[in-house]
């Protein structure tokens, strides 16, 4: 038994450095144990690759997940003001599938205007897993066309007597929308009152003050907390590894089956019968041993890529990846290795066709090349 295992192991690794000799043995005596071992190695290497690849990407995570805070005055939150809060469907900034409103309030002949949202689920802005940014659009108008003398943003913690405070006096100009991102958390410079806790943020207040009375309006849109997390962190390590394992097993099995089917069909078109399909599946499966090698090498190259923070919008994700990764040598090398590996499998398949049918090397290479072309086209549609 031990000798048989060693023999199987020697044959599958021999595919890498002496493919003609290895496939002669495999064709003479196809062994299911060998191809299963190959597939296990490929699955393991694919899990490693996917782990490295996913650990280099952080995805935007929001609270709330949509634009819900500025699409209704009361839901899982409440808007209040020194004026009358309302939804403005004509002047807003987000304009996404979740809604197209801003929250607005106006006062007459006053020196200040404030808007605050409270009674939402507690937001954690502390530690590595907490949210570390607050984003919002804000717009104000003063009919006297004067600038505010002061502006503050408060983050309430449990009650309105306990809060963090930041200055927002210079964030915007009259009648113009300003997109603002404020860093939040214990390592940021916020004034704290009454033992406010970053783990428990329960309300937000915008307040602008002028020296003289005037008719004032304030509007807020796109209000949410944000951080960036990797898919692995989001799922949890155990769940993420299980997902990667299942995903890798499915991907490897589908690639194996699809490639074998393409080779069989293309060979028939060229007048070559490769015999029983189940036998060919076992033989051609040994060629995937190279996948375990080039996948690990590519994972090593990708391990030096910079971590990228990706927004929710898919088009913006592609733009970020193109800007951060495409010019990177590690990405170029890693991608080139992946394609070189596909060509390597094609070359090994040509060896299999040549040995099984005793056809010319030219015809075997042509069949394998056409199969590669078919697989390439299919990848454009099904991945």
Name each region found by the language model.
Residues 1-17, 235-239:
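Short, membrane-interfacial amphipathic segments enriched in basic
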Residues 12-34:
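Cytosolic juxtamembrane amphipathic/interface segments immediately preceding
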Residues 29-54, 370-375:
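Hydrophobic alpha-helical transmembrane segments of multi-pass membrane transport/permease proteins
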Residues 88-117, 175:
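Short carbohydrate-recognition loop motifs
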Residues 108-192:
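Extracellular ligand-binding interfaces
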Residues 182, 204-206, 221-223:
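Extracellular beta-strand elements of beta-rich domains used
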Residues 205-214:
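Short beta-strand-plus-loop segments that form exposed binding edges in beta-rich domains
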Residues 276-383:
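Hydrophobic alpha-helical transmembrane segments and adjacent short intramembrane/lumenal linkers
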């Amino acid at each position: 038994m031990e000798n048989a295992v060693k023999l199987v192991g020697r044959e599958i690794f021999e595919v890498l450095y002496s493919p003609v000799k290895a496939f002669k043995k495999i064709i003479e005596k196809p062994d299911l144990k060998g191809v299963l071992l190959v597939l296990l190695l490929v699955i393991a290497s694919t899990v490693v690759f996917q782990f490295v690849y996913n650990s280099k990407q952080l995805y935007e995570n929001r609270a709330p997940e949509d634009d819900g805070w500025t699409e209704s005055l009361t839901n899982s939150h409440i808007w209040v003001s020194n004026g009358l809060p309302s939804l403005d469907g004509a002047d807003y900034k987000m304009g996404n599938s979740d809604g197209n409103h801003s929250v607005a309030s106006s006062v007459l002949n006053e020196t200040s205007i404030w808007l605050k949202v409270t009674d939402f689920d507690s937001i954690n802005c502390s530690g590595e897993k907490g949210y570390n940014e607050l984003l919002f659009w804000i717009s104000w108008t003063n009919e006297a066309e004067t600038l505010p003398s002061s502006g503050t943003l408060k983050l309430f913690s449990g009650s309105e007597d306990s809060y963090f405070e930041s200055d927002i006096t210079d964030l915007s100009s009259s009648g113009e929308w300003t997109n603002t991102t404020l860093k939040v958390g214990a390592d940021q410079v916020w004034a704290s009152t009454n033992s406010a806790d970053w783990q428990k943020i329960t309300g937000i207040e915008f307040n602008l003050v002028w020296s003289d009375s005037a008719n004032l309006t304030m509007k807020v849109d796109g209000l949410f907390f944000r951080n960036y997390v990797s898919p692995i962190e989001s799922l949890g390590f155990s769940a993420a590894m299980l997902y990667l394992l299942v995903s890798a097993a499915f991907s490897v099995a589908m690639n194996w089956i699809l490639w074998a089917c393409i080779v069989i069909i293309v060979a028939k078109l060229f007048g070559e019968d490769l015999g029983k399909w189940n036998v060919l599946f076992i033989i051609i499966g040994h060629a995937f041993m190279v996948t375990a090698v080039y996948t690990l090498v590519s994972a090593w190259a990708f391990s030096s890529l910079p971590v990228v923070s990706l927004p929710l919008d898919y088009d913006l994700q592609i733009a970020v990846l193109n800007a951060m990764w495409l010019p990177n040598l590690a990405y170029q090398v890693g991608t080139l290795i992946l394609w070189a590996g596909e060509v390597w499998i094609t070359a090994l398949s040509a060896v299999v066709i040549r040995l099984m049918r005793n056809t010319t090397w030219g015809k075997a290479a042509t069949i394998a090349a056409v199969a590669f072309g078919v697989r390439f086209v299919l990848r454009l549609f099904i991945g």
